[in-house]
A protein has these predicted regions:
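Short, acidic/glycine-rich phosphate-metal binding loop used to engage nucleotide
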Residues: 2-9, 14
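Catalytic-site signature of metal-activated, phosphate-bearing donor transferases
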Residues: 11-18, 24, 28, 35-197
């Protein structure tokens, strides 16, 4: 176990990657599970790999139930990589792999148990919106007072209508609403941070 100071999700993952001594690395978070089908697909691919990075469809869960709408599935993420061919962005939150090599895709899902209940959903929403606002502040981004409600409305429309959340019942509505509210608070917090650095 390696313990370090916390500088954001991207930097932490890149630090972890620097300790890998194998040819390939699979990055998964503590709330993610490799499905048996994905495991089989990865092992088969690694016998004769054609690419240096592979992405997989992440199946997000809300209160224990899979949500296949509102942009939550397929939520593709690059997670399997040949060490040295890619690195993680230095984003505080919503980090991603940066690479210029060829990439491939798996069809089997990575299971993401992101929200065990509504309490954990609200806690995570608050934490992620704070980190995203801090990232916007670090990049010197400034926004007007109408930005939070307008971005929130667009995000809800995008998730609920354009990405099919309306076909997912209460789970589809909840997933769409969670995305919209996170966007709203991200921009509210960014505006507040720009006015008051202590916030």
């Amino acid at each position: 176990v390696v313990e370090t100071d916390w500088l954001g999700y991207g930097i932490q993952k890149q630090r972890a990657l620097s300790f890998v001594e194998t040819t390939w690395a699979l990055s998964i978070d503590c709330d993610e599970v490799v499905s048996q089908a994905l495991k089989d697909e990865i092992l088969l691919t690694l016998k004769h790999p054609c690419h240096n990075v592979y992405r997989m469809p992440r199946l997000n869960h809300l209160c224990g139930r899979p949500v296949r709408c509102a942009g939550w599935y397929p939520d593709y993420v690059d997670r399997l990589l040949r060490v040295g061919e890619a690195q993680f962005s230095d984003s505080l939150v919503h980090e991603s792999l940066v690479f210029s090599c060829s990439s491939g895709s798996f069809s089997s899902p990575l299971l993401h148990y992101s929200y065990d209940d509504l309490d954990s959903a609200i806690d995570k929403l608050n934490r992620y919106s704070s980190l995203a606002a801090m990232s916007l502040k670090q990049r010197g981004r400034r926004f007007g007072r109408l930005t939070p409600p307008l971005r929130m409305c667009y995000r809800f429309f995008y998730a609920y209508v354009l990405r099919g959340g309306c076909f997912g019942g209460l789970d589809g509505f909840s997933a769409s609403l969670l995305q919209a509210v996170e966007v709203y608070f991200k921009y509210c917090k960014a505006i507040r941070k720009a006015r008051d650095p202590i916030f």
